[in-house]
Design a protein with these regions (language model features):
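Segments forming oxygen-rich coordination pockets for charged ligands
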Residues: 1-199
Length: 199
């Protein structure tokens, strides 16, 4: 899930389906004001969980990122890749002793950027590529030098993979129903029929 808050205060998208949107909006406005990205956590153990609207239980961890041309110069290129249906991932350092906000942008064949050291970069790229191959977004927990099974460093990997294809042969009533379901489930649906009238 993703949500953008513009300088005008306008909101695009949703993170929690309304549960903590008000608190996230306020935190986002603060990020816009200070131009400093931040991590926030809302959960049932927080004293203010009910106050911010987290009545459904659970925990939500968010990284609120300030984005403009100077802070995120790769943003337009990433958007173009997504528009062209090319797989791309962004690995952002969201928790560490230093370097918060550092990022690596990667495709299936190349990567640019750094999280601070070569070992951490290598581990993050390896983990992010595996997530990108499955179209999965997840936070990687690593050691400061990329060690596995540690949680000193958190790297949030956003994967933007093209939708899987569903090819339906035969343009009949049944195909129309399957196409609607396929599209609803996130597939890029193609219906093929040898009869020009129905294709």
């Amino acid at each position: 899930a993703a949500m953008a808050v513009l300088e005008s205060g306008e909101v695009i998208g949703s993170v929690s389906g309304g549960c903590v949107e008000g608190a996230i909006h306020e935190a986002s406005l603060e990020v816009l004001k200070t131009k400093t990205s931040q991590s926030v956590t809302y959960g049932v153990s927080d004293d203010n969980a009910f106050a911010v609207g987290l009545t459904c239980g659970g925990t939500i961890e968010l990284y609120i990122q300030y984005v403009d041309q100077s802070s995120f110069p790769d943003f337009a290129d990433i958007a173009a890749k997504i528009e062209d249906k090319k797989a791309v991932a962004v690995a952002t350092l969201v928790s560490a002793e230093s370097g918060i906000g550092a990022r690596i942008v990667l495709t299936k064949s190349d990567a640019s950027g750094s999280l601070g050291n070569t070992q951490l970069d290598h581990a993050a790229i390896e983990g992010a590529r595996a997530l990108l191959n499955h179209g999965t977004t997840k936070t990687l927990k690593l050691g400061p030098n990329g060690e596995n099974r540690m949680d000193d460093v958190s790297v949030f990997v956003e994967s933007f993979a093209p939708a899987p294809r569903m090819i339906i042969f035969g343009a009949i009533d049944f195909a129309a129903a399957v196409a609607r379901i396929g599209k609803f489930m996130g597939y890029y649906v193609i219906v093929c029929d040898a009869r020009a009238l129905f294709a």
